[in-house]
Regions:
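Conserved glycine-rich cofactor-binding loop
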Residues: 66, 71-75
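Catalytic loop of short-chain dehydrogenase/reductase
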Residues: 152, 156-186, 194, 202-263, ...
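Short, small/polar-rich loop/turn modules that mediate ligand/substrate recognition or access, typified
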Residues: 261-266, 325-328
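A glycine/serine/threonine-rich, flexible loop-to-helix segment
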Residues: 106, 161-162, 258-262, 269-301, ...
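C-terminal substrate-recognition "lid" of short-chain dehydrogenase/reductases
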Residues: 305-332, 337
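The beta1-alpha1 cofactor-binding region of Rossmann-like NAD(H)/NADP(H)-dependent oxidoreductases
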Residues: 99, 120-135
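Conserved glycine-rich Rossmann-like NAD(P)H-binding loop of the short-chain dehydrogenase/reductase
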Residues: 87-103
């Protein structure tokens, strides 16, 4: 018998089509094949115990953890410092300006469950990182949280030119557009993540042994500038932050991801959008805090505002405590990347 090709195809398709099965009508609303027995008191108790795991105290507990934060005296580093210290961690803060660090310890380190301890260092110098590691090792047997936050921005240039000569004038002829500027921003924002992390590996490993159920963690503060496709008028800074994100992933892979190493240390990065800091505003007040008027970002971010202390604080707690987070970028930007677009 002749069957057209079209008919044969539709017959074949019907063969694989969803066939509804006849479901027997239940005589009672309680099916013994699907549900367990009635709920006993001991089962209820077990459920109560299970509920405890979801308490904030358990999920986001940093009490008695030892932390080190670079650039902890201002901006985002200060937000991270306060977050950990007011929740019971012992937080060492480092930076080049001792006065800033001391002021933070005096202002924010009193009458809180944790503590803030200044230790000055320059994270662009390997020798200074070594001295810092020695200083912390002399005081502590372990480190639970390392936040590599210190960073600087680069020279800014306009890109809004519609002819080659003007664009060249802005990007090349500008006397402040120097290779040294690129080197400076790279030196501060990138190699330090490598040298700080590797200098503290033994202390970090001890941190995982010290607290049951805790793997020590490195959190690099990168930026959405390493993700968006626009140069935001600072090519060198954005290139350095893209490098910071990639370096975080390589470190996570080599230190804890590969079967050869598998150290119990989680390495992630937080990519902030715009937050008030000395970098973004050029100054800080007597509280060592900086301020950006909300209106300035009304049209620039879907959140219609710059980031707040609490936005950064909750991201830091999440990245520090979530034991299943490793090798990732946590973007906290009020939707900036959504609007600006990524590469
Ligand atoms: N604020 C934002 O909108 C934003 C957005 C995305 C990413 N970020 C990143 O967040 C991090 C913190 O920046 P911030 O915005 O909070 O700016 P900030 O207030 O200027 O903080 C930077 C901190 O880093 C320290 N620092 C700089 N160079 C150092 C060095 N060589 N050795 C040791 N410490 C050094 C500074 O202290 P000293 O000068 O005393 O050394 C300062 O406390 C940076 O990595 C930045 O790229 C910021």
């Amino acid at each position: 018998m002749f069957v057209s090709r079209r008919l044969a195809t539709s017959a074949r398709l019907r063969q694989f089509a969803y066939q509804p099965r006849a479901i027997p009508i239940q005589t009672s609303s309680f099916s013994t094949s699907r549900c367990h027995n009635a709920i006993s008191d001991s089962l209820r108790q077990k459920a109560q115990q299970n509920n405890q795991q979801f308490k904030l105290d358990n999920l986001f507990n940093v009490k008695d953890k030892v932390a080190l934060i670079s650039g902890g005296g201002t901006g985002i580093g200060l937000m991270a410092t306060q977050t950990l210290a007011v929740n019971g961690a012992k937080v060492y803060i480092t930076g080049r300006t001792e006065e800033k660090l001391n002021r933070v310890a005096e202002l924010y380190g009193k009458e809180i469950p944790g503590s803030i301890i200044p230790v000055p260092a320059d994270i662009t110098s390997k020798e200074s990182i070594q001295n810092l590691a020695d200083a912390i090792s002399q005081r502590e047997s372990h480190l639970s949280i390392l936040i590599n936050n210190a960073g600087i921005s680069s020279h800014t240039q306009t890109t809004e030119h519609d002819n080659a000569n003007d664009l060249r004038k802005s990007l090349f002829d500008d006397p402040d557009a120097t290779i040294k500027d690129w080197e400076d921003v790279y030196r501060t924002n990138v190699p330090q993540l490598f040298f700080m992390t590797t200098a503290f590996l033994p202390l970090l490993k001890n941190g995982s042994k010290t607290h049951h159920g805790w793997s020590s963690t490195v959190i690099n503060i990168s930026s959405i500038s390493g993700i968006v496709k626009t140069a935001q008028h600072h090519f060198a800074y954005n290139a350095s932050k893209a490098a910071a994100i990639h370096l975080t992933k390589m470190l996570a892979n080599e230190i804890s991801g590969s079967p050869e190493s598998r150290l119990p240390i989680r390495i992630n990065n937080i990519a902030p959008g715009v937050f008030p800091s000395e970098m973004t505003t050029g100054e800080s007040d007597e509280m060592q805090k900086s301020y950006i008027p909300k209106e300035k970002y009304e049209k620039k971010t879907p959140a219609r505002r710059p980031g707040k202390d609490e936005d950064m604080g909750s991201a830091v707690l999440f990245a520090a405590t979530n034991q299943y987070l490793n090798g990732q970028t946590v973007v906290v930007d009020g939707g900036y990347v959504l609007a600006a677009g990524s590469v």
